[in-house]
Amino acid sequence: MKLKIKKGATVQVITGSDKGKKGTVIAVDANAMKIQVQGVKVQTHYDKKDGLLKKEGFIDYSNVKLVEAASKEKKTSKKATKSKSA
């Protein structure tokens, strides 16, 4: 299924323990309908080499709302810019 929320978009959590928090989307798993948001659902993992690591966990797509979509910069060719200025 195609999701409207893309990597780099700003979202707000609407349910759960992190309700009200805003952050940018780090990763999207469209098959599982899960997204990873910076600063939301931070989990602690233990690694023998590095010790305790804090990492964001995935949350369900339905638990967030889109605040600001990821912006795509339009790529213009050199021909298009020359013709506009002439």
UniProtKB/Swiss-Prot annotation:
Give UniProt keywords alphabetically.
Answer: Ribonucleoprotein, Ribosomal protein, RNA-binding, rRNA-binding
Question: Can you supply one Gene Ontology CC term for this chain's record?
Answer: ribonucleoprotein complex
Q: Name one GO biological process term.
A: translation
Q: Which CDD domains match?
A: KOW_RPL26
Which superkingdom? Answer: Bacteria
| GO function term, MF aspect, one | structural constituent of ribosome
The signal sequence is none
Which Pfam families does the record associate with it? KOW
Family of this protein: Belongs to the universal ribosomal protein uL24 family.
Among PANTHER family, the record links this protein to: MITOCHONDRIAL RIBOSOMAL PROTEIN L24 (PTHR12903)
What's this chain's function? One of two assembly initiator proteins, it binds directly to the 5'-end of the 23S rRNA, where it nucleates assembly of the 50S subunit.
Q: What is this protein called?
A: Large ribosomal subunit protein uL24
Query: What species does this protein belong to?
Result: Bdellovibrio bacteriovorus (strain ATCC 15356 / DSM 50701 / NCIMB 9529 / HD100)
Q: Please name the gene that encodes this protein.
A: rplX
